[in-house]
């Protein structure tokens, strides 16, 4: 199988689980995400399996109790995840600390992550300070998550050079190709001392994705930085995914090359496709450019937050509403309101005071770590609710910790998946 071929390459890790993968399994594929990671792990015994984890948000769009974070990471490690890439959409270290410590306690590799962005309030020292904090938490490595492809080659060189002076854990780079800079940035970062790069196999690379594995390997061959990866081993893998891509061509975004507007709008690749679909469903595809122009304005109002799940969805949806209503903030979404109230954590800079006062309605904003406000018996309460639902519905569903976690993170679609799991074709 293609998994055995990937396993023979000698990669540092393969990102095969977490976030959108878990969601897609139960929402679209009718596939048990826990079984998926067990199967992948069994077929790739030589390659560490990696997942993306949204810190205190885990895989979802809200904060969970420390108890649930510990439980989820424990079960993820047991089922086959080795490397946990942990980030927070606001770069609030308080939202990453529990997940990092839970990973370490379960003998996983904790990779602390900075969600790279640019703004009037972000500079080199911002990233150095956050990286030092993540190292202090005990992280085994650091990832620079450049989800919108904004890190240019020379800033990348400067950033990695400075980080290598300040921290002593390995540094990884995750950069999307949307702006056309990812490959050049990767090479400059390697020259500055970068330890590892995220790439995609050539047939699934570039545009919304990452630089091609083969391209990066080829560039670094016969240099002081060569990867020791055999290009010939990559060809059958590229061939396999070339066919897979044809099968799902109807679901691809419209971007065919580079979209330089992202350098100013800062919209990540995944967010672009979501916006296109959102506007298409509302017969408003012609408003796409207006929405792209509105996004930086909303982001500024919300404290120059990075655009990565879930903040990318919050900003994107609010921008769409502002444009379609032809009036800014006539309607404020529940999620935008929560962010203004401080319920997601500390924003990089102060949010718009007028908007904040409007949603607070005389109350005080949240200034503590949001998870400190959550009842730590959340897991037991969710388990009781789960048992009650399957009991009343007379459903033959095992009350395993994995199933309870599916229900905890995705109550509606999770239960629908569990009800129909044995009926999938």
Stretch-by-stretch model annotation:
Residues 5-25, 255-262, 266, 270-425:
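Terminal or standalone catalytic/regulatory effector modules within metabolic enzymes
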Residues 13, 17-135, 139-142, 149-153:
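Active-site beta->alpha loop and helix N-cap motifs at the rims of alpha/beta catalytic domains
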Residues 86, 146, 192-209:
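Glycine-rich phosphate-binding active-site loops on the catalytic face of alpha/beta enzymes
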Residues 86, 142, 193, 216, ...:
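Conserved, mostly hydrophobic/aromatic
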Residues 117-120, 179-180, 203-208:
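Short gly/pro/ser/thr-enriched loop/turn and capping motifs at secondary-structure boundaries
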Residues 122-134, 179-195:
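Catalytic cores of alpha/beta
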Residues 184, 209, 213, 217-220, ...:
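Core active-site phosphate/anionic-ligand binding loop and the adjoining beta-turn-alpha structural block
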